[in-house]
From Swiss-Prot:
Annotated residues for binding of GTP: K73, T89, T95, D180
UniProt-annotated location(s): Cytoplasm; Nucleus; Lysosome membrane
Amino acid composition bias (Gly residues), ranges on this chain: 39-55
Protein name: Ras-related GTP-binding protein C
UniProt record, GO biological process: cellular response to amino acid starvation; positive regulation of TOR signaling; positive regulation of TORC1 signaling; protein localization to lysosome; protein localization to membrane; response to amino acid
Pfam families: Gtr1_RagA
Name of the coding gene: Rragc
Keyword Acetylation annotated: yes
Length: 398
């Protein structure tokens, strides 16, 4: 395996000019406690994208983490967004208040996560659930697959029924969690049983239009990142544009698979239209870890200043099966990770030129670094990849 670093081409006009990308702790920041259940964090439109980091909290879609006590809600939040080791989550205390976590370090992975205590009483007159649900983009209900889930299914039905009546545009996601201790057959049977019972309860209540999405998850593998990627993608209005840009890029560059990663959380916010192979996704996640770890050792200055990931970040890893992993910085918190064959990588000049066009298009979509305050009602037009090269020949349009 070889690891190479190279200097990025001339920075794009309008690109961010900060010397450092990530803070030294390389994370999203300190968790904020929500002191009152019905206070603060007002609601933007259900599945709409948030404004830039400088925008008001009310502009950001919310993701609610709900479920019974000890189902793993806080562990999921800590592992995905705060880089906590899964083994350390064993020492987390049970949540007894609503905690709000502001995820706003990039131009579009920009939302709030509200972690709810296990026994939330919707009939408590002091709990304004209508206000909370009205400003929510997605509700994630976590079910412990290793425990008796009948009570969890009852609470799931009560929760999604009330939420749907307040905000029918909300996305409803069910994490069948802690499946690492189950056999493959048991996982499939548990998912089938929970899926059947939950949808039967909704049908009996006349809520056939309410759609639940189910995911098998564990914090001890990449399944929780894969599931959260799917949840976050539904909150990104620019997702079709991103997928289209990735499809154009890989088809003109001889690349087999490409992911657009949020580097901090390792959530992929977009990929091309080909099916996602879990092994490929895990390989790309591991590459990000390797690049950041090596950069932290060799890329920082003697006084510890600098950043492990910045506008010059680029890495190539060649595997012994003729597969090449190629990572390039796209924006301040985004990286493009590609999987391709060694023979395709011989045309690196073509790939780099097409990547430059792709990167410029991404900057145009999100206007990264142009302004920190953008009205949420403003809709940025999606650019096309002009002058993209195919087989080494530039052309005016695609």
């Amino acid at each position: 395996m070889s690891l190479q670093y190279g200097a990025e081409e001339t920075p794009l006009a309008g690109s961010y000019g900060a010397a450092d990308s990530f803070p030294k702790d390389f994370g999203y920041g300190v968790e904020e406690e929500e002191e009152e259940a019905a206070a603060g964090g007002g609601g933007g439109a259900g599945a709409g994208g948030g404004c830039g980091p400088g925008g008001a909290d009310s502009s950001k879609p919310r993701i609610l983490l709900m479920g019974l006590r000890r189902s793993g809600k806080s562990s999921i939040q800590k592992v995905v967004f705060h880089k906590m080791s899964p083994n350390e989550t064993l020492f987390l205390e049970s949540t007894n208040k609503i905690y709000k976590d502001d995820i706003s370090n990039s131009s579009f992975v920009n939302f709030q996560i509200w972690d709810f205590p296990g026994q939330m009483d919707f009939f408590d007159p002091t709990f304004d659930y209508e206000m909370i649900f009205r400003g929510t983009g997605a509700l994630i209900y976590v079910i412990d697959a290793q425990d008796d889930y009948m009570e969890a299914l009852t609470r799931l039905h009560i929760t999604v029924s009330k939420a749907y009546k307040v905000n029918p545009d909300m996305n409803f996601e069910v994490f069948i969690h802690k499946v690492d201790g189950l056999s493959d057959d048991h996982k499939i049977e548990t998912q089938r049983d929970i899926h059947q019972r939950a949808n039967d309860d909704l049908a009996d209540a006349g809520l056939e239009k309410l759609h639940l999405s189910f995911y098998l998850t564990s914090i001890y593998d990449h399944s929780i990142f894969e599931a959260f990627s799917k949840v976050v993608q539904k909150l990104i209005p620019q997702l079709p544009t991103l997928e289209n840009l990735l499809n154009i890029f890989i088809s003109n560059s001889g690349i087999e698979k490409a992911f657009l990663f949020d580097v901090v959380s390792k959530i992929y916010i977009a990929t091309d239209s080909s099916p996602v192979d879990m092994q490929s996704y895990e390989l790309c996640c591991d590459m990000i870890d390797v690049v950041i770890d090596v950069s932290c050792i060799y890329g920082l200055k003697e006084d510890g200043s600098g950043s492990a990931y910045d506008k010059e970040s680029m890495a190539i890893i060649k595997l012994n099966n003729t597969t090449v992993l190629y990572l390039k910085e796209v924006t301040k918190f985004l990286a493009l990770v590609c999987i391709l064959r060694e023979e395709s990588f011989e045309r690196k000049g073509l790939i780099d030129y097409n990547f430059h066009c792709f990167r410029k298009a991404i900057h145009e979509v999100f206007e990264v670094g142009v302004t920190s305050h953008r009205s949420c009602s403003h809709q940025t037009s999606a650019p096309s990849l002009k002058a993209l090269a195919h087989n080494g020949t530039p052309r005016n349009a695609i």
